[in-house]
Regions:
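Transmembrane and membrane-interface helices of multi-pass
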Residues: 2-171
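Membrane-interface soluble catalytic domains
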Residues: 2-25, 37-43, 58-65, 131-133, ...
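A long, amphipathic alpha-helix that forms part
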Residues: 50, 54-55, 193-197, 334-341, ...
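Active-site-proximal alpha/beta segments of enzymes that process anionic O-linked groups
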Residues: 162-214, 218-369, 460, 464-496, ...
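Metal-dependent active-site segment of extracytoplasmic phospho-/sulfohydrolases and closely related
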Residues: 212, 387-426, 467-468
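Short, solvent-exposed loop/turn segments at the edges of secondary structure
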Residues: 256-257, 436-438
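A short acidic, glycine-rich active-site loop
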Residues: 268, 321-323, 374-385, 431
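Short beta-strand segments
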Residues: 290-292, 349-355, 382-385, 407-412, ...
Length: 512
């Protein structure tokens, strides 16, 4: 009985100890911060490491004010991104630097309301810590046992080689490495813009026609009725004659990394920006135009806008600065109409549309969604397919009206993946599923007399080869890769490295 009483007394003393209460408070805070940093699964070692780090750093006023408080505030700011996209990556960093004001506002509106509870909870931890922990800082001598535990834990992780796997370390190392990778890619692109194209053609281009490339955004192939989705999302493409590629994949899961690898020569990790679709067309004697509804930021400092600058004539509907506005893709059509009316054959027109870029409902230009669903976001997303389908139809009709030979290409830069947020499915960027890369590719021409389905595997890394083939361009150098890729040998760039596409997880479409 005395033993039981002694144990109870010690337990009571331990539970009421300010040091223990402080530590337990930091345990709760660490759980919130881990979620805010974008990590789903949580291990005990991560909770212990963050709790100890916060407790020990908070004991010293200087580190509390210059490390702990800024860290918690940063986590609160990052929390909405972390919930949706996970820890920092090149995709997140590039979006941060290349999103204009209008797109930033759309992003905030597109975040599910429940996601804003986490940053509020994260900020709330500051007030809780200030009220119940920091008003009476722990004496240094009382933190000594925690220092011992922290040092033992740290050395154990160092010896096992697992320090980098700790969420706190991984978060900041991912942030730094992603920023460095972003800067490296931008530096390579900048250097490439000052290089000369290396195209050497075998004779003059005899295929005098007009070529239109419509570059889409965020469209998954499996949501198109053209490729079997039961809801009629692409009625025009369902019936028009042309060539349709049912096994085509993009190079990367986001615009920043996908389009430079699609529209310029690339080995996957790097790309030669000067050897791009525009300089290839110009080498073949085509006059080039670039009409874009995507943002032009600063002094032409996005990878795709740098390619656009190689064109003979270019026009951006939004400039990407504070004057950016929510322009509709349909505003590009009069530009194409005017150009076709004033020119003959021998031209390349690139139309870069917003397509199915989030916020999906904003892409509809004020029109109500074509489809209805309990999932309003999915209804708007599929309605953007109808809008893109109509855009392609109008461009096709304009080309037909010229009574001149033409070829119209359409592809999407990347797909999206489903995310379960608070029990509801959303479509967001990702790089771990096949559907992040499974996108449409089609070619419509004036000479099509039937519908042709190409089931052979193709990769966007070979888009230049396909375009050259369709345009009758024969190159002496550099040698382009084959337009058809053997099954099982397709690799994609996931933002960090080249990975086997066929080994990625499946993410099937949702039905309305």
């Amino acid at each position: 009985m005395k033993t039981h009483t002694a144990i109870s007394n010690k337990t009571h003393i331990l539970a009421t100890s300010p040091v223990v209460r402080n530590f337990l408070l930091f345990v709760v805070v660490s759980l919130i911060l881990i979620k805010a940093m974008g990590y789903g699964g949580t291990k005990g070692v991560d909770i212990l490491f963050i709790s100890l780090s916060l407790l020990l750093l908070s004991a010293i006023p200087l580190t509390r004010y210059f490390l702990v408080i800024p860290y918690i505030i940063f986590c609160a700011i990052y929390a909405p991104v972390g919930v949706i996209y996970g820890p920092p990556s090149v995709s997140v960093v590039s979006a941060l630097f290349q999103t204009n004001r209008a797109e930033a506002i759309e992003f905030l509106y597109a975040i599910p309301a429940g996601c804003y509870l986490l940053p509020c909870a994260t900020l709330l931890t500051l007030f809780i810590l200030a009220r119940y922990s920091w008003q009476q800082p722990l004496p240094v001598r009382k933190t000594l046992p925690f220092w011992v535990i922290f040092i033992v834990l740290l050395f154990a992780r160092i010896l096992s080689g697992g320090v980098g796997n700790l969420h706190l370390v991984d978060f900041f190392s991912s942030l730094i490495s992603s920023y460095q990778s972003y800067n490296q890619q931008m530096a390579e692109i900048e250097a490439g813009t000052h290089s000369q194209p290396s195209w050497l053609l075998n004779g003059a281009n005899s295929n005098k026609a007009n070529y239109v490339i419509v570059v889409g955004e965020s469209m998954r192939r499996d949501y198109m009725s053209l490729f079997g989705y039961p809801t009629p999302t692409t009625p025009f493409l369902d019936h028009v004659n042309g060539t349709f590629y049912s096994n085509y994949i993009s190079t990367a899961p986001n615009t920043f990394e996908s389009l430079p690898r699609t529209l310029a020569l690339s080995d996957g990790k790097t790309h030669h920006i000067a050897d791009n679709i525009i300089t290839l067309a110009k080498a073949a004697g085509l006059h080039t135009y670039w009409f874009s509804n995507q943002g032009l930021i600063g002094q032409f400092d996005t990878p795709i806008s740098k390619i656009a600058m190689f064109s003979d004539e270019h026009q951006f509907l939004k400039k990407g600065d504070y004057q950016s506005r929510n322009t509709d893709d349909d505003e590009l059509l009069p530009l194409l109409q005017t150009a076709l009316a004033h020119n003959g054959v021998g031209n390349l027109y690139v139309l870069h549309i917003m397509g199915s870029h989030s916020d999906f409902c904003e892409r509809l230009g004020g029109e109500p969604p074509v489809f209805t669903s309990d999932n309003a976001e999915l209804a708007c997303y599929l309605s953007t397919y109808r809008k893109t389908d109509r855009f392609i139809e109008h461009a096709y009709q304009m080309l037909q009206a010229t009574h001149s030979p033409f070829k119209l290409f359409y592809f999407s830069d990347h797909g999206l993946s489903h995310r379960d947020i608070d029990g509801k499915l959303y479509l967001r960027h990702g790089g771990n599923n096949r559907q992040n890369y499974e996108v449409p590719l089609l070619v419509l021409s004036d000479s099509d007399r039937q519908r042709t389905l190409i089931e052979n595997p193709h990769s966007a890394f070979d888009f230049l080869s396909l375009f050259a083939q369709q345009a009758g361009i024969t190159l002496t150098q550099p040698q382009l890769p084959a337009a058809v890729t053997a099954q099982g040998k397709r690799h994609v760039f996931n933002g960090q490295e080249m990975v086997d596409f066929d080994q990625l997880a499946n993410d099937p479409p949702e039905l309305l």
